[in-house]
A protein has these predicted regions:
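Carboxylate-rich, polar loop motifs that coordinate divalent cations or form catalytic acidic clusters
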Residues: 1-173
Length: 173
């Protein structure tokens, strides 16, 4: 009986202390110097975090924050890192950010580069990478851009598109 009490005591006292809560850090807008609303998040291959923020794309390297505002000061709704590029979607525009020779992120509009005609008031909420294709989803269309061939496709929907999903190489919406 004493052995049973000791065993129970040991398990309750010591095993209860082995579970730790993972560290959670909260960053208020005053720390990262941008708006308080973030719409999306992605992580690049070099482990930097990127956030779609009301004032641009936020970059966090684990210790420092840097804001990359859009040229037209529009809200960034979506962000997706892929290789050396960080794709973003905003108000009537989508494109990518890439580092120049000085290490600064520079924005390139794919709407301008490909000569894409977007709808009035269109915003881009989700970005997916599928093989050589980059997909930008608004509430009524999905724009597909092939990075190798530079071909574009537009999928229109009579219903609102709330999100897109990649399941084993097949896109669902």
């Amino acid at each position: 009986m004493r052995l049973l009490k000791f065993t129970l005591f040991f398990h309750i006292v010591f095993l209860g202390h082995t579970q730790e809560h993972p560290p959670v850090m909260t960053f208020p807008p005053e720390i990262y110097n941008a708006a308080n609303q973030n719409w999306g998040i992605t992580q690049s291959d070099d482990l930097k975090m990127y956030f779609a923020n009301n004032t641009g794309v936020l970059e966090f390297n684990g210790s420092k924050w840097k804001l990359h505002p859009t040229d037209d000061s529009s809200i960034v709704r979506s962000v997706k890192a892929d290789g050396s590029k960080v794709y973003s979607g905003s108000y009537m525009d989508f494109g990518y950010w890439e580092r120049n020779q000085y290490g600064d992120l520079i924005y390139q509009s794919l709407v301008e580069e490909y000569g894409i005609s977007v709808l009035e008031e269109e915003q881009f909420w989700t970005i997916k990478v599928l093989d050589d294709w980059i997909l930008f989803q608004s509430l009524s269309r999905i724009y597909m851009l092939n990075r190798d061939t530079k071909k574009t496709r537009v999928i229109e929907s009579k219903d609102e598109i709330w999100n897109i999903f990649n399941v084993e190489g097949i896109i669902y919406f």
